[in-house]
Design a protein with these regions (language model features):
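Bacterial N-terminal signal peptides that target proteins for export
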Residues: 1-12
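Intrinsically disordered, low-complexity Ser/Thr/Pro-rich tracts
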Residues: 5, 19-31
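Bacterial N-terminal signal peptides
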Residues: 11-20
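Short, low-complexity N-terminal intrinsically disordered segments enriched in polar/charged residues
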Residues: 26-67, 71-75, 227
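A solvent-exposed, acidic/Ser-Thr-rich amphipathic alpha-helical stretch
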Residues: 66-167
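Short beta-strand edge/turn micro-motifs at domain boundaries
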Residues: 161-165, 183-216
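Ser/Thr/Gly/Pro-rich low-complexity, disordered linker/stalk segments of secreted
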Residues: 224-242
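Intrinsic low-complexity, glycine/proline- and repeat-rich
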Residues: 251-318
Length: 318
């Protein structure tokens, strides 16, 4: 079915090109049909990648992290070993590490939120198992919506990887706490496995956040909302000003000793003097080969032919 959809999309792109160029133009000898087909394939790839990113947004919004990891993240062992989920304070590296934080940590966060909601609403759940509570009340009273905008999708010339950028104005809220708006930059790498695009590296860097009813000069409640799951669910409400709060991972999840967590100290405190993280942003452009040396996400402007990097050596060096 998916293959059929891809073929239909490619044919639709070719049809659009035919209409734009004109049938007469295609009949001329100077029209390279292989080039036209390549253009159509790239357009198809870009649309599929956009759809996958949108699925990530909705999976996260509905708390379906397990389904997300199983459906749209990488499957091949080599790619799973080098998969990463990054935020301002560091990176989870490896599929198992991401799973522990993004799936298991999320379930823990949602359970705490569900119990809190039931307590506030005088709902009797005495004798219920954790699984029953999650099934009925998981996600109730919680909002996690990271809308993606300004898509920049660069597919490699070999059609096997892609570097992408989105900006996200988002909203996070939890029952009993003040909601926050959150402004983030997403840098995402995709890789094609058996003809299907899969999410490989997901890096999300927060520029700033503020309460729904407060100015940036006011106070915020809770932490950010990411791998650990709750949008501030595990972040403690604080009377301190946002400048004094130390930012934690989404849901406040802590890395397990079983997995590697690459700590990056570039963003420890919020500062009104600089409403950006200390991470310099590089936007995806046409590029030559996949490289980590261009920053934590985003390439330089070069022609891009293939991925071409020893990931093990890069991780050892960093």
């Amino acid at each position: 079915m998916k293959k059929t959809i891809r073929i239909l999309l490619s044919l639709a792109c070719v049809a659009a090109l035919v209409l734009s160029l004109g049938v007469g133009a295609l009949a001329k000898s100077d029209i390279d049909l292989e080039e036209v087909a390549a253009m159509a394939q790239k357009a198809c790839d870009q649309q599929e990648i956009q759809n996958i990113m949108s699925w990530h947004v909705m999976y996260h919004c509905y708390g379906l992290h397990r389904e997300e990891m199983e459906e749209i993240w990488v499957n091949e062992p080599e790619n799973r070993a080098t998969a990463s989920f990054g935020q301002n304070q560091g990176f989870y590296v490896g599929y198992d590490s991401i799973w522990e934080a993004y799936v298991e940590g999320h379930d823990t966060s949602w359970l705490a939120t569900a119990k809190n909601y039931c307590a506030q609403s005088d709902i009797d759940i005495e004798g219920w198992t954790d699984e029953e509570i999650l099934e009925v009340y998981g996600g109730v009273g919680q909002l996690l919506l990271h809308v993606t905008t300004t898509a920049i999708i660069e597919v490699a010339e070999d059609g096997q990887t892609a570097k992408c950028f989105w900006y996200s104005p988002g909203m996070i809220a939890e029952s009993g706490q003040t909601g926050n708006t959150i402004w983030e930059a997403y840098g995402v790498d995709f890789v094609k496995e058996d003809g299907e695009w899969k999410m490989w590296h997901l890096h999300m860097f927060t520029d700033f956040m503020g309460g729904f009813y407060l100015t940036l000069g006011g106070k915020t409640s809770g932490g950010m909302g990411g791998p650990g799951g709750g949008g501030g669910a595990s972040g403690e409400a604080s009377g301190d000003s946002s400048e004094q709060q130390e930012w934690k991972g989404e849901g406040g999840a802590q890395a397990s000793s079983k997995h590697d967590y690459l700590y990056s100290p570039q963003y420890k405190e919020f500062s009104h003097d600089r409403l950006r993280s200390d991470m310099e942003i590089f936007l995806p452009k046409a590029y030559d080969e996949w490289s980590f040396d261009d920053g934590n996400y985003g390439p330089t402007r070069e022609e891009y032919e293939s991925f071409g990097i020893d990931l093990d050596a890069w991780y050892d060096a960093h």
